[in-house]
């Protein structure tokens, strides 16, 4: 009846709030916590029952319906499964439930897709097509450091050490790390900074006054337009990161060092690049040997 449902919802929401606070204390970032919250609230909304009453069948059915309705990818469904798993495992640890209903739901096999990288030629074409000294510096910095675009836009002039050819970036979850750039990037960055007339501390600013710090969307748009002009498929900042990782593994860089360079919290994330290399080998074998 309505009253019981209302009581269930109140106690479910209370437990969710405690869980999200625990995640915050563990150091999860605000966007992650919001994603956890909205994902779990969806379950409460579609299957309103007491936390202790959820069964493995309920969760399986929910995931199946969700996938069908939203035509979701396996990766999305596995992310939702992981969030449910984290929530119910926490409830079990804190003795709110006897056993997590997600425990018997296995990881969704996602099948590693071989995602595209930029060829050396692509990167040279992009460099050659730059009409603005700033854009050349952006491409060089992305290509040689493999940093995230969200890290790039936060950089200030002071974060760059030209002598050491390195800079400090603030990664996901406010973690600082050092990244390194090559001689070509150093020269192009210096040229760009020398050409600037503004006093903004930001490393990259808009081309026109009032010379505001560039935003992620601005950099993405710029790269996409350059790619279109050159007929290079889907040029976006993350592709430079993926390219650097793939090249590093190709050349035999130890996976732990690559993890540090890319700022991955979990080595699984870095290992995906190594696995992709492996599937490239498989594709090549099928193509040439059968």
Where are these regions (language model features)?
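Catalytic-site neighborhood detector that most strongly recognizes the C-terminal catalytic loop/helix
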Residues: 117, 172-173, 262, 266-287
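Conserved tyrosine-mediated DNA breakage-rejoining catalytic core shared by Y-recombinases
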Residues: 145, 150, 154-191
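C-terminal catalytic core of tyrosine-transesterase DNA break-rejoin enzymes
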Residues: 140, 144, 241-265
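Basic, Lys/Arg- and aromatic-enriched nucleic-acid-binding interface segment
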Residues: 97, 112, 120-149, 173-175
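Alpha-helix N-cap/helix-start motif at helix boundaries, enriched for small hydrophobics
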Residues: 33, 84, 138-139, 146, ...
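Active-site/catalytic core of tyrosine-dependent DNA strand-transfer enzymes
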Residues: 182-232
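N-terminal core-binding DNA-recognition domain of tyrosine recombinases/integrases
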Residues: 2-6, 14-114
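Short pre-functional
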Residues: 41, 85, 136-150, 166-167, ...
């Amino acid at each position: 009846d309505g009253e019981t449902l209302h009581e269930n919802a109140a106690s479910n929401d209370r437990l969710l709030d405690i869980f999200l606070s625990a995640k915050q204390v563990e150091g999860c970032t605000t966007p992650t916590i919001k994603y956890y919250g909205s994902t779990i609230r969806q379950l409460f909304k579609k299957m309103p029952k007491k936390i202790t009453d959820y069964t493995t069948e309920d969760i399986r059915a929910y995931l199946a319906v969700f996938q069908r309705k939203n035509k979701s990818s396996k990766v999305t469904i596995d992310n939702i499964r992981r969030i449910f798993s984290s929530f119910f495992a926490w409830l079990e640890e804190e003795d709110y439930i006897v056993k997590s209903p997600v425990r018997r739901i296995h990881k969704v096999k996602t099948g590693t897709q071989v995602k595209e990288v930029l060829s050396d030629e692509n990167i040279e074409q992009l460099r050659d097509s730059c009409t603005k000294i700033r854009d050349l510096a952006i491409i060089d910095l992305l290509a040689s450091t493999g940093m995230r675009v969200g890290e790039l836009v936060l950089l200030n002039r002071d974060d760059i050490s030209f002598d050491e050819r390195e800079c400090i970036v603030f990664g996901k979850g406010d973690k600082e790390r050092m990244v390194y750039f090559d001689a070509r990037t150093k020269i192009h960055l210096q040229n760009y900074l020398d050409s600037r007339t503004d006093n903004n501390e930001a490393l990259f600013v808009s081309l026109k006054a009032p010379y505001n710090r560039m935003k992620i969307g601005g950099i993405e748009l710029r790269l996409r337009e350059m790619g279109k002009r050159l007929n290079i498929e889907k040029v976006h900042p993350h592709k430079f990161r993926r390219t650097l990782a793939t090249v590093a593994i190709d050349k035999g860089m130890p996976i732990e060092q690559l993890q540090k360079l890319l700022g991955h919290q979990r080595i699984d994330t870095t290992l995906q690049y190594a696995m992709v290399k492996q599937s490239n080998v498989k594709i090549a074998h099928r193509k040439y040997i059968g």
